[in-house]
């Protein structure tokens, strides 16, 4: 058995296969997933699992050099970053939700959560560990 927090085999495999600059998306239950990236559907019920929980597990294994969130997520939170963004190792950059959705096409994997908060999505860009 693995010793790290992330137990989901497909998600762990996707992270292990990342190269520098590759992207993984953690999305809410409503984020459209394009046909190209690996789809990892973790949604069980509304709210389960939450983006914050999946993000914590992913960050236990992934070196992140850049993160992206939709401007609409910040606007919806009254001008502040969503609470789960505090777990990110870097300050996220913002872009429109439409541009966010376009970038998901280039992601290596899109992880669907049960999160039902609008715009609760983040793109994680892989860094290097050396």
UniProtKB/Swiss-Prot annotation:
<protein>
    <recommendedName>
        <fullName>D-ribose pyranase</fullName>
        <ecNumber>5.4.99.62</ecNumber>
    </recommendedName>
</protein>
<dbReference type="Pfam" id="PF05025">
    <property type="entry name" value="RbsD_FucU"/>
</dbReference>
<dbReference type="InterPro" id="IPR023064">
    <property type="entry name" value="D-ribose_pyranase"/>
</dbReference>
<dbReference type="InterPro" id="IPR007721">
    <property type="entry name" value="RbsD_FucU"/>
</dbReference>
<feature type="active site" description="Proton donor">
    <location>
        <position position="20"/>
    </location>
</feature>
<comment type="subunit">
    <text>Homodecamer.</text>
</comment>
<comment type="similarity">
    <text>Belongs to the RbsD / FucU family. RbsD subfamily.</text>
</comment>
<dbReference type="InterPro" id="IPR023750">
    <property type="entry name" value="RbsD-like_sf"/>
</dbReference>
<dbReference type="GO" id="GO:0048029">
    <property type="term" value="F:monosaccharide binding"/>
</dbReference>
<feature type="binding site">
    <location>
        <begin position="119"/>
        <end position="121"/>
    </location>
    <ligand>
        <name>substrate</name>
    </ligand>
</feature>
<keyword id="KW-0119">Carbohydrate metabolism</keyword>
<dbReference type="GO" id="GO:0005829">
    <property type="term" value="C:cytosol"/>
</dbReference>
<comment type="pathway">
    <text>Carbohydrate metabolism; D-ribose degradation; D-ribose 5-phosphate from beta-D-ribopyranose: step 1/2.</text>
</comment>
<keyword id="KW-0413">Isomerase</keyword>
<dbReference type="GO" id="GO:0016872">
    <property type="term" value="F:intramolecular lyase activity"/>
</dbReference>
<dbReference type="GO" id="GO:0062193">
    <property type="term" value="F:D-ribose pyranase activity"/>
</dbReference>
<dbReference type="GO" id="GO:0019303">
    <property type="term" value="P:D-ribose catabolic process"/>
</dbReference>
<feature type="binding site">
    <location>
        <position position="97"/>
    </location>
    <ligand>
        <name>substrate</name>
    </ligand>
</feature>
<comment type="function">
    <text>Catalyzes the interconversion of beta-pyran and beta-furan forms of D-ribose.</text>
</comment>
<feature type="binding site">
    <location>
        <position position="28"/>
    </location>
    <ligand>
        <name>substrate</name>
    </ligand>
</feature>
<keyword id="KW-0963">Cytoplasm</keyword>
């Amino acid at each position: 058995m693995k010793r790290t927090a992330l137990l989901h085999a497909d998600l762990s495999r996707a992270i292990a296969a990342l190269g520098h600059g590759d992207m993984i998306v953690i999305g809410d239950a409503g984020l459209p997933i394009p046909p190209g990236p690996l789809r990892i559907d973790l949604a069980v019920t509304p709210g389960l699992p939450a983006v914050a929980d999946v993000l914590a597990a992913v960050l236990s294994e992934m070196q992140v050099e850049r993160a992206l969130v939709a401007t609409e997520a910040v606007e919806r939170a009254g001008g502040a970053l969503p609470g789960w963004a505090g777990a990110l190792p870097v300050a996220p950059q913002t872009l429109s939700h439409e541009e966010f959705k376009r970038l998901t096409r280039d992601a290596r994997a899109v992880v669907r959560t049960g999160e039902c908060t609008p715009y609760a999505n983040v793109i994680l860009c892989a860094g290097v560990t050396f």
